[in-house]
């Protein structure tokens, strides 16, 4: 698997210093075991597990730190745990746990990580799954218990509303 050059991780200054001391690149962290990271970073096993998971999830094309954090939020710590999962069901679980519905492109990301976990095929990005998601939702809709509040209505989440995104695009033009 080809490593991404840019992996973002929420590391402390001490953890960054230890990685520099051992000449370890962020893009290589997913190749270490949790036990090795625990030792190298002088971290708890839980912290090492989370760092490793965030690094591994970012090896998937077009997946960044925020979505990697979403996967950890759902309790996943390795790509192998996502094998044979259903991207639509993961989306529905995520929305229930967050108590708001999310941007539809996030479902495309769930579909991508499941696909990647099953195949290892790095040739696709999340937007390759948009037609599949649209077809599925047209045929199946969303669950009756889907949260009513949208992600952009949540306070302090750093999300932009669809209208704000259009405004930003217009300002850049």
Task: Mark where each language-model region is.
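C-terminal extensions
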Residues: 1-173
């Amino acid at each position: 698997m080809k490593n991404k050059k840019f992996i973002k991780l929420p590391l402390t200054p001490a953890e960054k210093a230890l990685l520099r001391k051992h000449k370890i690149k962020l893009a290589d962290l997913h190749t270490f075991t949790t036990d090795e990271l625990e030792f190298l970073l002088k971290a708890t096993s839980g912290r090492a597990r989370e760092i490793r998971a965030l690094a591994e999830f970012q090896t998937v094309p077009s997946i960044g730190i925020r979505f990697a954090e979403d996967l950890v939020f759902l309790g996943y710590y390795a790509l192998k745990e996502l094998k044979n999962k259903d991207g639509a069901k993961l989306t529905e679980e995520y929305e229930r746990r967050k108590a708001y519905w999310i941007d539809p492109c996030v479902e495309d990301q769930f579909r991508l990580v499941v696909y990647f976990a099953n195949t290892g095929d790095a040739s696709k990005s999340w937007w390759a799954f948009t037609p599949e998601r649209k077809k599925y939702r047209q045929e199946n809709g969303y669950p009756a218990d889907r949260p009513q509040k949208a992600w952009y209505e949540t306070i302090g989440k750093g999300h932009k509303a669809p209208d704000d995104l259009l405004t930003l695009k217009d300002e850049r033009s």
